Amino acid sequence: MKMIAWMQHFLETDETKLIYWLTFLMVCMVVDTVLGVLFAKLNPNIKFSSFKIKTGVLIKVSEMILALLAIPFAVPFPAGLPLLYTVYTALCVSEIYSIFGHLRLVDDKSDFLEILENFFKRTSGKNKEEK
């Protein structure tokens, strides 16, 4: 019984629950990055690109910074904590879906980076034609 009471002590306040959500999100991000790099290196059909790795890490770091910066803005408001839990849950589900995509448990055919690259190529091509 002492052990259960000790474990419940960690979930008494909302701040500790937020820390656990952030920790879970960070673990999911690390697992997703490691699996992505590992499978890209081991699979000869996938082109290993340092640009994609840097972009992925940059996206994860920016998501974590935004998740941390949202805490001081959300806590003072009554609807802030449920909204923050919703955002953290959505980020965790997104990371878990990405992990499942690496493990080929879900069919994820979208290549967001390719869409962005094509968009920037088209916009930069228009700017060159106008000059």
Curated annotation (Swiss-Prot):
Domain of life: Viruses
GO biological process: viral release from host cell by cytolysis
Nuclease found in the keyword field: no
Keywords tagged on the record: Cytolysis, Host cell inner membrane, Host cell lysis by virus, Host cell membrane, Host membrane, Late protein, Membrane, Transmembrane, Transmembrane helix, Viral release from host cell
CC per GO annotation: host cell plasma membrane; membrane
Cytoplasmic topological segments: 1-52, 102-131
Principal place of residence: host cell
Xref: InterPro entries: Phage_holin_4_1 (IPR006480)
Localization terms from the record: Host cell inner membrane
Topology relative to the membrane: Multi-pass membrane protein
Membrane topology (Periplasmic): 76-78
Positions of transmembrane segments: 53-75, 79-101
Family: Belongs to the bacteriophage holin family. phi29likevirus holin subfamily.
Domain description: Isoform Holin has 3 transmembrane regions whereas isoform Antiholin lacks the first transmembrane region.
Name used for this protein in its record: Antiholin
Gene behind the chain: 14
